[in-house]
């Protein structure tokens, strides 16, 4: 019989909050006896925007902005019901997007 795997993908704009959340998830899973692979840092998505500074003329003067989306991947191998309950009860900080696949 194949072992069950829970794949957790985390996304955030702030890498410090993201690493803190990943650490909380790994600690909760390890406390219940599940095997954990990760957190694996995935490539950071960088979106760049150029905006003209002047409201009327001077296209040569532009300002650049960027948004960095940091991502982490955590695999919980062979989780028990206790592991899933512990992960559901975690209170993670705002600003972290969590995607869970069974």
Curated annotation (Swiss-Prot):
InterPro entries: Ribosomal_uS10, Ribosomal_uS10_CS, Ribosomal_uS10_dom, Ribosomal_uS10_dom_sf. This is Small ribosomal subunit protein uS10. Gene3D superfamilies: Ribosomal protein S10 domain (3.30.70.600). It comes from Roseiflexus castenholzii (strain DSM 13941 / HLO8). The gene is rpsJ. Involved in the binding of tRNA to the ribosomes. One of its GO terms (cellular component) is ribosome. Belongs to the universal ribosomal protein uS10 family. It comes from the Bacteria.
């Amino acid at each position: 019989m194949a072992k069950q795997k829970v794949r957790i993908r985390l996304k955030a704009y702030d890498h410090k909050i993201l690493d803190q959340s990943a650490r909380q998830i790994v600690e909760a899973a390890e406390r219940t006896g599940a095997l954990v692979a990760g957190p694996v840092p995935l490539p950071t998505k960088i979106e760049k925007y150029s905006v003209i500074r002047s409201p009327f003329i001077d296209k040569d003067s532009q300002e650049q902005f960027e948004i960095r989306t940091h991502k982490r991947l955590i695999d919980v191998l062979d989780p028990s019901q206790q592991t899933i309950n512990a992960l559901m009860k975690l209170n993670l900080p705002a600003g972290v997007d969590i995607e869970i696949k069974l």
